[in-house]
Amino acid sequence: MQSNNKLKKNQDFRMVYQKGRSMANKLLIIYIVNNNLEYNRIGFTVSKKVGNSVVRSRVKRLMKESYRLNEGKIKTSHDIVFIARPNCKESTYKEIESALLHLIRKMKLIS
C-alpha cells in the first residue's frame, strides 16, 4: 500500500464516518464512501479498548496484511476505514482476514 493510498488526516476520517455507509461483524466495522479518485484510500483504527499498544499494533498489522493480500479483488474509488472491535485481540490472522472479506463482500466491493 502506497503512502498516498492511506487516510491520515482526522478530517478525512471524520468525513468517512459522517458521510459513509457502515457495516459490522463480530471483529470489525467498515465505513465506506466514494472518493472520485482512481484508487482506494484506506484507514485502520484500533481503540484503546482493544488492549495495550503491543496488542493494538498487532491487530493493526493483521488488518493491513489482510487488506494488502486481497487488494486486487476490491473495487477502486472508495475511502475505506476499518475499525477493530475488542474481540480482535485474541483473533488469529485467518479470523481477521475472513471477517474483513466478509464485510467487503457485504458492501459489494468485490470486483
Swiss-Prot record:
EC number(s) stated in the UniProt entry for this protein: 3.1.26.5
Chemical reaction(s) catalysed: Endonucleolytic cleavage of RNA, removing 5'-extranucleotides from tRNA precursor
Molecular functions (GO terms): 3'-tRNA processing endoribonuclease activity; ribonuclease P activity; tRNA binding
GO terms (BP aspect): tRNA 5'-leader removal
Key word Hydrolase present: yes
Family under the similarity heading: Belongs to the RnpA family.
NCBIfam families reported in the protein's UniProt record: rnpA
Assembly and interaction partners: Consists of a catalytic RNA component (M1 or rnpB) and a protein subunit.
Protein name stated in the entry: Ribonuclease P protein component
